[in-house]
């Protein structure tokens, strides 16, 4: 399948998310499904912490389009199943989380892991194996500090492996810092970003808007699936 022609770069604050990325030592490119800001309301002010971009393997458009083409952007945005199909889809994903303000690695991973555990417990996938995976996940971040512009990359495979790498800018490192083989945890990481209780509603909206355009292109040119 060809990469959608309608794909564009996205800017989140001072962060640039290019339309395509190719990791080092790889011939495979990933396209930008969407990007948005993650923040919290603190004392009646929305404080922005991170810009998140979700990149996908090119076959994701045809895979998702089989079910979702023809839907409006608003319909996609309102459908949790659409986002769950992204999360659980049989294609690789590369998530880029770049910092807008300084974050301590331990504090960052504490909140992320709490959200992941809460989701896994709610859907009944949190067992001893996931508890061990969460411990590995936390250990990977314990010595990290993230100044503005630095990045965490999460590489997700359909089989359930979660690769973690850290960069002082937006450059994808050649080697992963850690690889955790646990599908419930891998899915939970993206679920907490774009699922039922998302940390980035802006990312969800970006995905819906952009995939609506990708699906229109797919309908106009069915050969794009080949």
UniProtKB/Swiss-Prot annotation:
UniProt keywords, alphabetically: Flavonoid biosynthesis, Isomerase
Signal peptide boundaries: none
Tissues where this protein is expressed: Expressed in roots, shoots, flowers and seeds.
Key word Isomerase present: yes
Positions marked as site (Important for catalytic activity): 108
Function statement: Catalyzes the intramolecular cyclization of bicyclic chalcones into tricyclic (S)-flavanones. Responsible for the isomerization of 4,2',4',6'-tetrahydroxychalcone (also termed chalcone) into naringenin.
Pathways involved: Secondary metabolite biosynthesis; flavonoid biosynthesis
Protein name: Chalcone--flavanone isomerase 1B-2
Catalysed transformations (reactions): a chalcone = a flavanone
EC number(s) from the headed UniProt entry: 5.5.1.6
Binding site for substrate: 50, 115, 192
Ranges in coiled-coil conformation: none
Chain segments annotated as transmembrane: none
One Pfam family, short name: Chalcone
Gene it is expressed from: CHI1B2
Misc remark: Part of the biosynthetic pathway for all classes of flavonoids, a large class of secondary plant metabolites, many of which are brightly colored.
GO molecular function: chalcone isomerase activity
Family matches, as InterPro entries: CFI, Chalcone_isomerase, Chalcone_isomerase_3-sand, Chalcone_isomerase_bundle_sf, Chalcone_isomerase_sf
GO biological process, one term: flavonoid biosynthetic process
Induction or repression: In roots by B.japonicum.
Family: Belongs to the chalcone isomerase family.
């Amino acid at each position: 399948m060809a990469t959608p022609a309608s794909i564009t770069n996205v800017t989140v604050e001072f962060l640039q998310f290019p339309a395509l990325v190719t990791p080092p030592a790889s011939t495979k490119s990933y396209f930008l499904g969407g990007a948005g800001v993650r923040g919290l309301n603190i004392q009646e002010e929305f404080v922005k912490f991170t810009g998140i971009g979700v990149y996908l393997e090119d076959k994701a458009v045809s895979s998702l389009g089989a079910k979702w083409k023809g839907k409006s952007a608003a319909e996609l945005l309102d459908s949790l199943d659409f986002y769950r199909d992204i999360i659980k889809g049989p294609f690789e994903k590369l998530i880029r989380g770049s910092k807008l303000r300084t974050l301590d690695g331990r504090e960052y991973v504490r909140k992320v892991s709490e959200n992941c555990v809460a989701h896994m417990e709610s859907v009944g996938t949190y067992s001893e194996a996931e508890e061990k995976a969460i411990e590995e996940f936390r250990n990977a971040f314990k010595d990290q500090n993230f100044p503005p512009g630095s990045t965490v990359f999460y590489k997700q495979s359909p089989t359930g492996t979660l690769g973690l790498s850290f960069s002082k800018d937006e450059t994808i490192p050649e080697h992963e810092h850690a690889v955790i083989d646990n599908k419930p945890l891998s899915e939970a990481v993206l679920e907490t970003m774009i699922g039922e209780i998302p940390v980035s509603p802006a990312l969800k909206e970006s995905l819906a808007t952009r995939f609506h355009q990708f699906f229109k292109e797919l309908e106009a040119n069915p050969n794009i699936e080949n």
